[in-house]
Amino acid sequence: MDEKIRINKYLSEAGICSRREADRMIEEGRITVNGKKAESGQKVSLEDEVCADNIPVHKNEKKVLLLFNKPRGIVCSTKQQFDETTVTDYLDYPLRVYPVGRLDKESQGLLLLTNEGDLVNKIMRAGNYHEKEYFVTVNKPVDSEFVRRMSKGVPVLDTVTRPCRVVQTGECSFRIILTQGLNRQIRRMCRYLGYEVQKLKRLRIMNLTLDGIREGEYREITAQEWEELNHLLETAAIMRMKELVQKLDRAAKAYYQQDTEIISNREYDQMYDELQALEKETGTVLANSPTVSVGYEAVDQLPKE
């Protein structure tokens, strides 16, 4: 009998959607297992008949990553609402793919689409410092003070944006490189400083660019790009692991010294679980990782599965 796995992971590996989106589809009653509505946390195997929106789900053999030059007016959703054109309807790709992240309806430029859920998780994982580059035109002239304040960080959505690189390219235009992806971040940053975005185009995500892709067209990732992307993702994962180890170490010391609690137990558990997942993904355990004391061998490298 085939090994059973959680249904959100099954759907992710089948290229239907990310695990988070799978959980949402399950809650909405859009997923069935052997004719019955799926339940959150349910486990399935290849012997089960899984359907998404009444369409049978099969594991993908070919893994795909598309680079799409999205025009304005296309929504980054796999579910059509009203008379909007979704990115999947627009592409009409022979395999079922879904967007990696978002690019709002009014924005244009590089959008990645894939049928590999784990890749989505790696790219979108919070805390990974993946570069994304944009060209932006605003409604009035920018100056050195605007560039300075945008670069330093702007208060939006109950936080302050990370420092970023901003270069003025024209009287009313600039390029910006972000390492985070808050909702409508650039538009909110500009609005805070008294500007309105008139054009927003994403030019690059990590090593992947729009070069050679006309608006409305797409191409598959090349073998060389795959190799470079995997290297960047692994490097980013290691950086995130180091950050997590430092935070967990500070929290543990504060606890044993009966100091002020710097994070809640829930936050500690979430970071610990993320660290374990990254260790499994990369096959690496840092020498000072707190997971070493709970069954891991204290080595720098572990065999990858």
Could you describe each region identified by the protein language model?
Residues 237-305:
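Phosphate/adenylate-binding "loop-and-lid" substructures adjacent to NTP/NAD/dNTP-binding pockets
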Residues 1-236:
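Basic, flexible Lys/Arg- and Gly-enriched helix-loop patches that mediate nucleic-acid binding at interfaces
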